[in-house]
Regions:
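Membrane-embedded alpha-helical bundles of multi-pass transporters/translocases
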Residues: 1-229
């Protein structure tokens, strides 16, 4: 009987998680469509639309460089393994070490890319006029810090998912997209969309899952020790 009850409990958790992520996916499609409509109506087929697309080139490279999306997949079994053994201290410790390392790498990479943005644009967009070049560089620099939010927030989401808590992680992309929409509507130009993307990244991918993890018992601090003493 205990095994049967445990199986039913596990099945219920899977069903709830599936419902949450299914609803999130559906809402993300709807909100994403609204975002595309707002971007299209606001920027149209002007040069600003091209700037909006080009502004993500360097930030997306930073995310790719640090394998932001893959980190959640990699960390989940690590956290689940600690929890399966009842090792809460180990789960806390492993999270802090990964989080601390990522934060250091992200800040360093962001600073380097922020400083190098004009030179990188010379390589990937040669022949661009000086005014357009300066405008694109400014947009890229607005978006670069957002990658810190996405990567660290993804790690916090993995912490929550390992504990079968999915609502905060599932709502993060929705809030990010809503930030883009609100920024574009308020600003009315490509810069407004970029500021909205940054604000949405802070609120959605970073703050919501991180605060949920802290409320759920995560004790977050810098920890650099490579091995247990």
């Amino acid at each position: 009987m205990p095994a049967l009850q445990a199986g039913r409990g596990s099945g219920a958790k899977i069903a709830v998680a599936g419902a949450i992520w299914g609803a999130s996916l559906l809402l993300s499609r709807v909100v994403g469509l609204v975002r595309d409509l707002v971007v299209g109506r606001t920027l149209g087929t002007s040069g600003e639309g091209d700037l909006w697309q080009a502004a993500f080139t360097i930030p997306d490279f930073l995310n790719y460089l640090l394998a932001g999306g893959a980190l959640t997949v990699v960390y989940l079994p690590i956290a689940a393994g600690h929890l399966a053994l009842g090792d809460e201290a180990g789960a806390q410790r492993s999270f802090r070490r990964v989080w601390s390392l990522l934060l250091a790498l992200l800040v360093l990479a962001t600073v380097v890319l922020w400083w190098s943005t004009p030179r990188i644009l010379d390589l990937i967009a040669p022949g661009m006029g000086a005014e357009r070049h300066a405008e694109l560089a400014a947009l890229v620099r607005i978006l670069l810090p957002a990658q810190i939010c996405h990567v660290l927030g993804g790690l916090a989401s993995a912490w929550l998912q390992a504990r079968d808590k999915h609502a905060a992680a599932a709502s993060a992309p929705l809030l990010y997209t809503l930030g883009i929409i609100v920024g574009g509507l308020l600003g009315g130009d490509v810069e407004g969309f970029c500021w909205g993307a940054l604000a949405g990244s802070i609120v959605g991918p970073l703050c919501v899952p991180t605060f949920a993890a802290l409320r759920g018992g995560l004790r977050l601090r810098f920890e650099w020790t490579p091995r247990d003493r």
